């Protein structure tokens, strides 16, 4: 039977000093012997997805204590990708994932905590904490801050519709809108606390936490502002004590992260991601999380799943006027998982933190089949329509649920948006280890695209050349040396894709990069090209005017240059060194250099790899 980790610092004469310090934090004699639960919070006033989390850690802590545990809270950093976007701040976003994972490991191992409740929300925070959870392999429950309510606009020059952050970015670069109209969109795009309202990276990852079995039902879709979300936090506090005692005191199996998030669970999570057209960043993060848990889940597995899982749900930015609040009304993640299960595309026998099996959980929480009033009540939680930064500030209810699986927000396999899923892996001579495209956001007319390369040595150059009209219809904009090492930090390319839209080129151009894309990206945007240019990838050999052939249905991408020419270019590049032609105006700090030194390519999740970690 496993012993509580915390006994290392709470028992024995040699730990008198440690116990003295524990007492100074408020612990008493009766607390020594109880499980110590780390409340891993990520509150910050910099990020709307985290601004409301300040008091929630202590709310969970009180619940832990009532259930018989000892709760100790600490905080991690949290970078807002939207605020860091478009300048050198974005260099820090992906590396912050590793910092978060390390900081959680440092705190939990240094203080010998027995279990964790991870309070995350936005882009790199959830995956960073998940990496730590798989690395530590102690009982854990994830509970996120929840999605933001969608913004709403109604102005003369635009149709009345729901909006989000990406709409504000596109509008700002459009010459068809007045300054006043742009300001109106800006003021209404992000009306409440929470993670941005579409199926962007943050919400995608919080949904995947449900599919991995590490979060409670409703985690990915219950709005940050709704009072129902409070129950998720309270239940997380109670449940973590229960499963911690079952693990340590009863030696019960199937309760640790690596026993829950198995290979089959990763297949479930990826199938969900493909079915809902989630962010391409989730590929990067799932690979990294699997790596930490020593799960052999690869790009080849993702490619295999992408060929058989249909697109069952389209959410902004892949479709207008559908946001996370609409997914919630349609039954949330367990309704999508239910449709996958009925299509024979889900592993139903994997455990979760709240149920013995995924199949059992679906039977209880999928509103299309479950006669469960609690589920029906949960998924009626509606937006409040009032600007606020406060969690649980409203209790509005939808009058009815969306259970239309023919034409609703969530579809059955028979009535899918497409039988081809929302994400695809492409391979070819320009991406020998693969690259990723969110097919749910690609217009059907350009699933096959051949164009001339317009090469940019940085995101900054691409933005300038798009806005100044140098990029023309038919171009494939190639942005290189923006990978994990080359950036360093693998920046998101949301501004270039948004500006292509604003210039009316969204269906006339492709964008190809060894960097990555925001979850807010749509269009023919292909990222994660591996190997990256800085590692000697073929993307570093592309020249202006080269023909690039993209064939999504056949999962291929090809640089139409003969092998002899490529070999000559490679020899020349080897001699010059794999770096941008012109020196970039970019300050690369010691911290970023350290990340770049160890970072792997996107095909391996951009994790750090030591020489003995091969």
Swiss-Prot record:
Q: Main EC class of this protein?
A: lyase
- List GO terms (cellular component aspect): cytosol
Q: Which pathway does the UniProt entry assign to this protein? A: Amino-acid biosynthesis; L-isoleucine biosynthesis; L-isoleucine from 2-oxobutanoate: step 3/4; Amino-acid biosynthesis; L-valine biosynthesis; L-valine from pyruvate: step 3/4
Q: Which GO terms describe its molecular function?
A: 2 iron, 2 sulfur cluster binding; dihydroxy-acid dehydratase activity; magnesium ion binding
What cofactor does this chain's UniProt record say it requires? [2Fe-2S] cluster; Mg(2+)
Q: Give the modified residues of type N6-carboxylysine.
A: 124
Q: Where is the active site?
A: 518
UniProt: Mg(2+) binding residues:
81, 123-124, 492
Name of a matching Pfam family: ILV_EDD_C
Give the source's domain of life in one word.
Bacteria
What is the protein's known function?
Answer: Functions in the biosynthesis of branched-chain amino acids. Catalyzes the dehydration of (2R,3R)-2,3-dihydroxy-3-methylpentanoate (2,3-dihydroxy-3-methylvalerate) into 2-oxo-3-methylpentanoate (2-oxo-3-methylvalerate) and of (2R)-2,3-dihydroxy-3-methylbutanoate (2,3-dihydroxyisovalerate) into 2-oxo-3-methylbutanoate (2-oxoisovalerate), the penultimate precursor to L-isoleucine and L-valine, respectively.
User: In which family does this protein belong, per the annotation?
Assistant: Belongs to the IlvD/Edd family.
Q: What is this protein called?
A: Dihydroxy-acid dehydratase
Q: Which organism is it from?
A: Ruegeria sp. (strain TM1040)
Q: Which gene encodes it?
A: ilvD
């Amino acid at each position: 039977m496993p012993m509580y980790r915390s006994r290392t610092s709470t028992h024995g004469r040699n730990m008198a000093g440690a116990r003295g310090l524990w007492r100074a934090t408020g612990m008493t004699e009766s607390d020594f012997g109880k499980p110590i639960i780390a409340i891993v919070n990520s509150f910050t006033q910099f990020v709307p997805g985290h601004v409301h989390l300040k008091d929630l850690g202590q709310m969970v802590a009180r619940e832990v204590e009532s259930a018989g545990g000892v709760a100790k809270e600490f905080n991690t950093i949290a970078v807002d990708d939207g605020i860091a976007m478009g300048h050198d701040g974005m260099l820090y976003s992906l590396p912050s994932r590793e910092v978060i994972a390390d900081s959680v490991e440092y705190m939990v191992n240094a203080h010998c905590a027995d279990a964790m409740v991870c309070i995350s929300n936005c882009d790199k925070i959830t995956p960073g904490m998940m990496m730590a959870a798989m690395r530590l392999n102690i009982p854990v429950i994830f509970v996120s801050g929840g999605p933001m309510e969608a913004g709403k606009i109604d102005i003369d020059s635009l149709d009345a519709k729901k909006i989000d952050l990406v709409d504000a970015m596109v509008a700002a670069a459009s010459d068809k809108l007045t300054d006043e109209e742009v300001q109106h969109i800006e003021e209404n795009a992000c009306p409440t606390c929470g993670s941005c309202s579409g199926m962007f990276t943050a919400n995608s990852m919080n949904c995947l936490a449900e599919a991995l079995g590490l979060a409670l039902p409703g985690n990915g879709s219950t709005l940050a502002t709704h009072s129902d979300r409070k129950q998720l936090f309270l239940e997380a506090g109670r449940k973590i004590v229960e499963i911690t005692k079952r693990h340590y005191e009863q030696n019960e199996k199937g309760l640790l992260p690596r026993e829950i998030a198995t290979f089959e669970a990763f297949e479930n999570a990826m199938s969900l991601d493909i079915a809902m057209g989630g962010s391409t960043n989730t590929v990067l993060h799932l690979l990294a999380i699997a790596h930490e848990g020593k799960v052999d889940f690869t790009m080849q597995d993702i490619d295999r799943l992408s060929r058989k899982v249909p697109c069952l749900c389209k959410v902004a930015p892949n479709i207008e006027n559908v946001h996370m609040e609409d997914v919630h009304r349609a039954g949330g993640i367990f309704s999508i998982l239910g449709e996958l299960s009925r299509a024979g595309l889900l592993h139903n026998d994997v455990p979760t933190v709240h149920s013995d099996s995924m199949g059992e959980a679906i039977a209880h929480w999928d509103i299309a089949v479950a006669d469960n009033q609690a589920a029906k009540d949960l998924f009626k939680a509606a937006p409040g329509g009032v600007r606020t930064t406060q969690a649980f500030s409203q209790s509005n209810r939808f009058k009815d649920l969306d259970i239309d699986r023919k034409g609703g927000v969530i579809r059955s396999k028979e009535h899918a948006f497409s039988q081809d899923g929302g994400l695809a892996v492409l391979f070819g001579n320009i991406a020998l280890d693969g690259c990723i495209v969110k097919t749910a956001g690609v217009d059907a007319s350009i699933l096959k695209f051949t164009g001339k390369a317009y090469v940019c040595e940085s995101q900054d150059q691409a933005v300038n050349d798009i806005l100044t009209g140098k990029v023309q219809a038919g171009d494939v904009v190639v942005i290189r040396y923006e990978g994990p090492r080359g950036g360093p930090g693998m920046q998101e390319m949301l501004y270039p894709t948004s500006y292509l839209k604003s210039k009316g080129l969204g269906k006339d151009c492709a964008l190809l990069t060894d960097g990555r894309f925001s979850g807010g990206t749509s269009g023919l945007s292909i990222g994660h090209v591996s190997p990256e240019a800085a590692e000697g990838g073929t993307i570093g050999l592309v020249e202006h005017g080269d023909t690039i052939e993209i064939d999504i249905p056949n999962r291929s991408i090809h640089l139409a240059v003969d092998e002899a020419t490529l070999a000559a270019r490679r020899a020349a590049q080897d001699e010059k060194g794999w770096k941008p032609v012109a020196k970039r105006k970019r300050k690369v700090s010691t911290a970023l250099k350290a990340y770049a030194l160890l970072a792997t390519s996107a095909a391996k999740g951009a994790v750090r790899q030591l020489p003995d970690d091969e």
